[in-house]
Amino acid sequence: MTEFTKLRWLLSAAGLVMYVADVCTDAALVLTYFKEKHVVCAALTLLFIVVGLLVTQVFSTAWYWDDMDCDEKREDMKTTLPVVSKRGLATLHLFGVGIFIRYYQMLKRGFGVAWGTVEPVEEIKNQQHFLFGLAADLSMLRLLEAFLESVPQLLLQLYIVLGQQECSLVQLVGMSFSFMNAAWALVDYRRCLRRSLPDVRQMPRGLPTAIYLLYKLFTITSRVLGYALLLIFSIYSTVGLAIVWLLGTAWTHRLHTDFCSSQSLEFLYRAIVGVILTFTFFNVKGQGTRDAMITYYFLHSLINVLSLLLLFVLRPDLLTLAALLCVSTLMAACSVLGLVCLVLYYLLLHPTEACREADEVDGLEIKTRSKGRLRDFLYP
């Protein structure tokens, strides 16, 4: 049986620290921009923070309500806030503490399991089961927050830094934490997803995890750099980004996803998936992905080449030659290394499963609502 170990507890605590640090550095950026009279930059930075916070609170509330309405919920699977009503939970989330409540639940119960303060064997099994359900919900919320706040924040800061051709300490720290927060969310989500699938081997630690992480980080970095160059070329490139988002949202809508219990939340979910697809590839509904992935990364490479050509040929005055060569080299290297890591992972390191296609699919029997949500969410 998979166990919630001391290491898992410590990593969960580290994830909470990373989340708080990312929010704090972004808040520091907002204050810095306001002090420097950069009102637009401050407003955009604050907007990304608020959007990420608001969306995660909405989904966290909806999932708590779904769990409270679940007829099959057992006594040991209930929330650690039994005296709180639906209205009370909504009020707590209104103050933006939804993720903190979930971390409190997981760290409190996880401490008892990992450090052996829970005695009966059956109780330990129940707690293990509940803890991995909490981890599943948190991994999805952190992924949403990463692509609605951290990654757009990284794009904005890169655009500002490249445009000004200088980088302050606050900007450097903010970009670093946004980068690490996105990386943490990606790996944690991947591991939680595979752990939730009953007939699928867990994602191995060590080299496979490192290669998968590098694949995602390299491809996201090259994509963000390409978008930043397009924005430097013309601020009207935001129209192009909006079109890319609309295409991703339309594709998700065409797949008829059924992640949410309400139609309005389902439309919001599809719009968010469109944002995620703007920056990285995810298997939206467990269908075969080879052709879709090839098409996606071909277009990804095309956008990167286009952004470089536009700056080199039409607006070489916007960046110094040294800066342009540095960004071009970094973007090309990240694109190549990301695709190499992608091929290495899926050819040599991806866990093979018996009685299952290469891509995990929906429709399996589930043991908890949290794990059921996870299987219907996204497939990396």
Swiss-Prot record:
Top-level taxon: Eukaryota
Pfam families in the record: XK-related
Protein location: Cell membrane
Entry membrane topology: Multi-pass membrane protein
Transmembrane segments: 10-30, 39-59, 81-101, 167-187, 228-248, 264-284, 294-314, 329-349
A GO cellular component annotation in the UniProt record: plasma membrane
Keyword set, alphabetical order: Cell membrane, Membrane, Transmembrane, Transmembrane helix
Substrates-to-products reaction catalysed: a 1,2-diacyl-sn-glycero-3-phospho-L-serine(in) = a 1,2-diacyl-sn-glycero-3-phospho-L-serine(out)
The protein, known as: XK-related protein 9
